[in-house]
Swiss-Prot record:
It comes from Legionella pneumophila (strain Paris). Catalyzes the condensation of carbamoyl phosphate and aspartate to form carbamoyl aspartate and inorganic phosphate, the committed step in the de novo pyrimidine nucleotide biosynthesis pathway. It catalyses: carbamoyl phosphate + L-aspartate = N-carbamoyl-L-aspartate + phosphate + H(+). The gene is pyrB. Transmembrane segments: none annotated. The keyword Lipid biosynthesis does not apply. InterPro entries: Asp/Orn_carbamoyltranf_P-bd, Asp/Orn_carbamoylTrfase, Asp/Orn_carbamoylTrfase_sf, Asp_carbamoyltransf, Asp_carbamoyltransf_Asp/Orn-bd. One of its GO terms (biological process) is amino acid metabolic process. The lineage of its organism: Bacteria, Pseudomonadati, Pseudomonadota, Gammaproteobacteria, Legionellales. GO terms for molecular function: amino acid binding; aspartate carbamoyltransferase activity. This is Aspartate carbamoyltransferase catalytic subunit. HAMAP family: Asp_carb_tr (MF_00001). Belongs to the aspartate/ornithine carbamoyltransferase superfamily. ATCase family.
Length: 297
């Protein structure tokens, strides 16, 4: 694996290998050392979980880590991102973790620069967030062993969610039994990669084994008069009442950051069924598996 860009570019066998390797790291705490490998983290969008998770993964693997401060870099002077990467590669940096608001940017960089560097997609616009899909599936298979028997519900702004896009792809690759995308009509995707769409919250949650709640992007609500926060809260929030339609042992997940009292209530986020912090923990091990796969190949 030369780059890690999209779930759709991986085989089911590659995905299974990443999942099992992540669990191996978690349970054994036995980590290989890649002290000769140098990696740079370039985050052109704000991030807490993904950025720190990748950095911890890199340090667990004994990689040399460079965190580029974009506020003091030549990007402020107008330098193109491909020139930044070429410059860093000339200094000996081989691996680049990149988050950017532009859809497809990491794929374009891989096409232009792929002979000399390895690109890891840490999120591109509304397009893809493949490492989130891996860590989410690691979290699920820890508790639910038969993916083909599961009903998974993902709730929120599906249309603009890179998390939802990548998760649909990984469910398709691994043969998840039933994936339901729950969203108000205006947030429903124009293209469904896998699963079925509904705007009926209770119907979508009925009998679900896993419920994934997405963040409501308040900045997008303010820009669009058609989106009403109170309407969303009243009809699509994950509350104790709405969660009761899912199975009693249903897992509750959220990629973060959460808007408590908007898309999810605190008693759900902090309740016995919540696996949100488990996702954060597994994110480090999932990203270790991804990085190792790139280095080893």
């Amino acid at each position: 694996m030369k780059h890690f860009l999209e779930i759709s570019q991986l085989s089911s066998e590659q995905i299974e290998s990443l999942l099992q390797r992540a669990l191996y790291f978690k349970h054994t705490k036995q980590y290989p050392s890649y002290s000769q490998s140098i990696i740079a983290n370039l985050f052109y969008e704000n991030s807490t979980r993904t950025r720190i998770s990748f950095e911890l993964a890199e340090r667990h693997l004994a990689m040399s880590v460079v965190n580029l401060d974009l506020q003091t870099s030549s990007e402020i002077k107008g330098e193109a991102i491909e020139d930044t990467i070429r410059t860093l590669a000339a200094m000996g940096i081989q691996y680049f973790v990149i988050r950017h608001k532009q859809d497809g940017l990491q794929q374009n960089l891989a096409n232009k620069l792929g002979d000399t560097v390895h690109i890891i997609n840490a999120g591109d616009g509304t397009h893809a967030h493949p490492s989130q899909a891996i860590l989410d599936m690691v979290t699920i298979i820890e508790q639910k062993k038969r993916l083909d028997k599961l009903k998974i519900a993902i709730l929120g702004n599906i249309k603009h969610s890179r998390v939802a896009n990548s998760f649909q792809c990984i469910c398709s690759k691994l043969g998840v039994g039933d994936l339901v995308l729950i969203s108000p009509e205006i947030w429903q995707p124009s293209q469904v990669h896998f699963g079925r769409v509904t705007d009926n919250l209770n119907e979508g949650l009925e009998g679900a084994d896993v419920v994934i709640c997405l963040r409501v992007q308040r900045e997008r609500l303010l820009e669009d008069d058609h989106l009403d926060l109170d309407f969303y809260r009243n009809n699509f929030a994950l509350t104790q009442k709405s969660l009761s339609y899912a199975k009693p042992d249903a897992m509750v997940m959220h990629p973060g950051p959460m808007n408590r009292g908007v898309e999810i209530d605190s008693e759900v986020a902090d309740g016995n069924q919540s696996c949100i912090l488990q996702q954060v923990t597994n994110g480090v091990y999932a990203r270790m598996a991804i990085l190792e796969s790139l280095i080893a190949s």
